[in-house]
A protein has these predicted regions:
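Conserved Radical SAM active-site core
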Residues: 2-121, 130-133, 159-163, 167-170, ...
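Auxiliary Fe-S-binding modules of radical SAM enzymes
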Residues: 3-9, 162-271
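Hydrophobic faces of well-ordered beta-strands that scaffold small-molecule active sites
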Residues: 64-66, 96-98, 121-125, 148-152, ...
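Active-site beta-loop-alpha junctions enriched in small/polar residues
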Residues: 69-71, 101-103, 126-130, 153-155, ...
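A general structural detector for well-ordered alpha-helical segments in enzyme core domains, enriched
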Residues: 80-87, 136-139, 190-194
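Anion (oxyanion) recognition and catalysis
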Residues: 89-92, 144, 192, 199
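Histidine/lysine/aspartate-rich catalytic loop segments that bind and position anionic ligands
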Residues: 125-129, 133, 141-172, 177
Length: 271
């Protein structure tokens, strides 16, 4: 079971992958400014919230993706992060996926009792091209952690990560194309290369989305957001191979015609 926890919202664009940030796009659709960074009111303490029966709303065994509309190691969030670490410390039965582009800030902002890592935390860095992979992956490899991963999203070039995968420290690699208002293409050969590298190193690889523009055999395919994960899974490029029968995005509850956006708050603007 995978869910999202956004203890704060908003971010500052940091590198090439941020040029067409999905969070900025979705905030624009809601007449909001994605660069406005704030602590969320209702969900800040989500892992500790309980229902009327006294049970945690985030169930034991959940994979909780943290800060998907921000960056966990954002400078502006320094004043809130210790509270979040404390909540993570209290929920050892939940796995927290912590993803960042700011790899150089990780080591100095881990909790004092981090030691050689926490069993319920996966540290993940995003690397959109070879330059960022060569910058960020060595930093993450030098940080003590029980679980590490990296994500190539939006993937903007072929990425050779053989030397990093060969360390045996990475458990999982993910790749996604650029979506929402971005049109920089994702190429089949880039994904196939990552698949082959991960297969050789016996590291899990998940191709999670084609992006808006997917190029294969010299032909560019424009793929609607609702079909991008479906097409990625049907490609057979994940490793190990997995079930390709995945659900489509739900339809907007108002217009019933268009697919709802990720993180939809039913604003009605898809009409």
């Amino acid at each position: 079971m995978m869910q999202i926890w956004n203890p704060w919202h908003g971010c500052r664009k940091y590198s090439e992958g941020c040029d067409h940030c999905y969070m900025y796009y979705l905030d624009t659709q809601r007449d909001r400014d994605g660069s406005e960074i704030y602590k969320t009111k209702t969900n800040f303490n989500l892992p500790l919230k309980k229902d009327r029966q006294g049970n945690y709303k985030i169930q034991s065994g959940t994979l909780l993706h943290v800060c998907m509309t921000s960056d966990f190691f954002l400078e502006e969030a320094d004043k809130w992060r210790e509270e979040v670490w404390d909540m993570i410390r209290q929920r050892l039965d939940v796995t927290f996926w912590i993803q960042t582009k700011r790899a150089e800030r990780i080591a100095e902002h881990l909790p004092k009792d981090w030691g050689d890592g926490w069993e319920n935390v996966i540290l993940c860095v995003t690397t959109e091209n070879q330059k960022r992979a060569d910058e960020r992956l060595p930093i993450l490899l030098d940080i003590p952690a029980k679980h590490t991963a990296f994500m190539c999203a939006p993937i903007l070039s072929e990425i050779h990560a053989e030397q990093y995968l060969a360390t045996g420290q990475f458990e999982r690699v993910l790749a996604d194309g650029e979506n929402y208002d971005g049109t920089r293409p994702c190429r089949y050969e880039w994904i196939k290369s990552l698949h082959d590298q991960c297969e050789y190193a016996n590291v899990e690889f998940d191709f999670i989305g084609t992006g808006n523009i997917f190029i294969k055999d010299g032909k560019a395919y424009r793929i609607p957001k609702a079909y991008q994960r479906v097409q990625a899974q049907r490609s057979g490029l994940s490793y190990p191979s997995r079930n390709t029968d995945i659900p489509m995005q739900p339809k907007c509850r108002f217009c019933k015609r268009k697919n709802s956006c990720n993180g939809c708050n039913w604003c009605g603007k898809c009409d």
